[in-house]
């Protein structure tokens, strides 16, 4: 992992996801983790551009909304802009130097690129809704309610960067002492630095997972509600549907990584780290739960919108938290979460397979590209001979 291209032969089927031999040839014919290849193919098939969605009607409808409802939409847009500003660079900048599985390496690059499309989407929306979109962007870093969430995410990414430097420094020091024929007093310095980094990485993965699993969904609910229950702003709902579809892939990826580490696929040390960090991982999720509830209060401080209110949004957040924590192997202290989905109608926006539309009536958001199976064997060819 100290070189951009490992020239030594590597058995990719036996490489761990992190801290392995270092990446060499980018190859996609074999994978230790088929899930990552499936996510890559799916994400590529989802490729879209926000400019493809016309927002002229949305702009006219937005301008007719009461000011407090405009504020709800704008604040959510600001918050999502911040989240995807982080996710548009942090996974690549922080995780990729530690990755040793080729398919995971490509998945993180693909995932991060898709987040930049999300960021561009917010610019597309703002250009269409506001006379001065730059003013809206400039206000984001001045919003305390938004920025405290950035700090709670960024500090875990930053800690991985710090721990990575400390591990690299420890390796260099051990190598220097060895080359000089000197005896290093602290013989465990490198291993200790690596384990500290592993713990930091494990917790950072939970922060990423919580971000993808919960943080976007208050904003999603509000945006989809404008279309579903208020019957306005269809274009924005379609863009957010594209984004939500991508985020579910990203969530599946982080959940898979976490569960593999917890199960010991990459070694028993990860199992021990998962056990040691379980309470801190639970605390991470519960902090996200509290912050999103605070965000709901902030959004609806001047009034509710048809179909949504603070109480139902809190129930939605609890419902998501219990489900998402279970999916990543964590116990959840919430005991009074609703059993039934508080917003069952949102599923039609989160699952693109649920909605069927006539192509001549609406712009399809469920159209996939690059979905042809090119694997044709001799048996398939023989079956076609009867037609010739």
Swiss-Prot record:
PANTHER family: RIBONUCLEOSIDE-DIPHOSPHATE REDUCTASE SMALL CHAIN, RIBONUCLEOSIDE-DIPHOSPHATE REDUCTASE SUBUNIT M2. Binds 2 iron ions per subunit. Keywords: Deoxyribonucleotide synthesis, Iron, Metal-binding, Oxidoreductase. Heterodimer of a large and a small subunit. Belongs to the ribonucleoside diphosphate reductase small chain family. GO terms for biological process: deoxyribonucleotide biosynthetic process. Fe cation 1 binds at residues 84, 115, 118. Transmembrane segments: none annotated. This is Ribonucleoside-diphosphate reductase subunit beta. It catalyses: a 2'-deoxyribonucleoside 5'-diphosphate + [thioredoxin]-disulfide + H2O = a ribonucleoside 5'-diphosphate + [thioredoxin]-dithiol. It holds the Pfam family Ribonuc_red_sm. One of its GO terms (molecular function) is ribonucleoside-diphosphate reductase activity, thioredoxin disulfide as acceptor. It comes from the Viruses. Its EC number is 1.17.4.1. It is an enzyme of class 1 (oxidoreductase). The gene is NRDB. CDD domains: RNRR2. Fe cation 2 binds at residues 115, 212, 247, 250.
